[in-house]
Structures are given as C-alpha cells and as structure tokens.
C-alpha cells in the first residue's frame, strides 16, 4: 500500500492537518477495501473537528479521488483546503471538497480530461470512450458545485488541459482566496489607522494654537 497522506497538527491553533502529498494512490482503489477504510478511519478520529487539508499532488486514481472527495464532504467539521504546490487532475477535484479553498500565490491548479490505457477490438475501445465520458461528467459535477460555471465551459477547460495560477483559479471560482494577500491588507489598514492618529494629533495641536495665542495677547496688554 502506498500511503500518500499523513496527519499533523497546527501548533498555533491545534487544528488537525491532513497532508496529501504526491500521487493519489499509485494503485487503484477499485476493489481495494483496506486503503479506503484506513483513510476513513483516520479521518473519523477527527470527527466534528475543523480540519485543514494541504494538497501538493499531480493527481492519480479517479476512484480514490472520488472517495476522498466524498469522505471530506461528509466530514462533520469544517474543511479548509490549502493548495501549496500543485493540485492537478484528480487532486483538483479533491480540493473542491473544501468549505473554503485557499491557494498559495506560487501554486498551480490543472484540470484535464480523464485518460486511460486500454487494449482490445473496436467495441472494447467504444466502451472505454463511453466510460471516460461518464467519468468526465462526474468530475464536472464537483467543479460545477464549487464554481457555478456552465458545464460546457468546464468541459472546454478540461479539453484544453487548463493550467491556472492562484489568481486565475480565484477568478473562475475554483478557489476562494489567495493565501497571504490579507497580510498586505492588514498592514495597509494598520498604516491608515496610524496615519489617522497622527493627523488627529496634528489637528488637535493646530486647534490649540489660537487659544494659546489669544491668551498670550491678553497677557501682553495688561
């Protein structure tokens, strides 16, 4: 079994963190009862708790991706997804399970059509094509729920093998926030607040000038 996930904890907030790193299941979860159960059992240890899910993955098995997506959607606490490197292929629709989805300004997301290897006669290939078309529709379901984009537009993005930086992903609705951008806003807010205090102090000093001057003139005329 290739365990592509592990659990850590944010030392500042004590929030459980699920880290998805590398290929999502090098072997398919189709017919595998052990690996999905292990993943679910570990997730259930944090039942009712808010969790963060860090993703850096090129994707992998669609069945595994589907099960992980569903387990995260079923989680009773809030799920905050953070993409720090790459969320491609099946990892991209796993990310859609987040109640909130954040992305590093240096990270990338990629969506494309499902693919497979097959052999046989023309009927076998026709069945494979039909199966891939249904898988595409299933993946679009996850994208559509998050982005609210039309299905034909999502299908076109997949056909084009679309790569998105964080700002493009936010523009299209795949994520909610680009990480660390609020720090600049907070800094600017702090600066504005300080500037207001300085201006207020200066104005107060100016307002005191006529009073002092009047007092001085009155003293001089005595």
Region spans (language model):
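N-terminal organellar transit peptides
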Residues: 1-90, 98-217, 222
């Amino acid at each position: 079994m290739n365990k592509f996930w592990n659990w850590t904890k944010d030392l500042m907030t004590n929030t459980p963190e699920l880290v998805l790193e590398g290929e999502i299941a090098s072997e398919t979860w189709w017919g595998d009862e052990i690996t999905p159960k292990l993943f679910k059992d570990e997730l259930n240890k944090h039942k009712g708790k808010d969790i963060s899910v860090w993703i850096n993955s090129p994707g992998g098995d669609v069945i595994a991706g589907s099960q992980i997506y569903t387990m995260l959607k079923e989680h009773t606490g809030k799920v905050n997804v953070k993409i720090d490197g790459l969320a491609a292929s099946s990892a991209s629709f796993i990310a859609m399970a987040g109640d909130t989805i954040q992305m590093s300004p240096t990270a990338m997301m990629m969506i494309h059509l499902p693919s497979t290897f097959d052999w046989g006669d023309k009927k076998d290939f026709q069945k494979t094509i039909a199966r891939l078309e249904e898988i595409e529709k299933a993946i679009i379901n996850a994208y559509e729920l998050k982005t609210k984009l039309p299905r034909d537009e999502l299908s076109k993005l997949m056909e084009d093998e679309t790569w998105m930086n964080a700002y493009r992903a936010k523009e299209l609705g795949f994520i909610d926030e680009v990480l660390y951008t609020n720090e600049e806003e907070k800094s600017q807010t702090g600066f504005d607040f300080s500037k207001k205090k300085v201006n207020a102090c200066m104005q107060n000093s100016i307002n005191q000038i006529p009073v002092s001057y009047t007092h001085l003139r009155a003293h001089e005329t005595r």
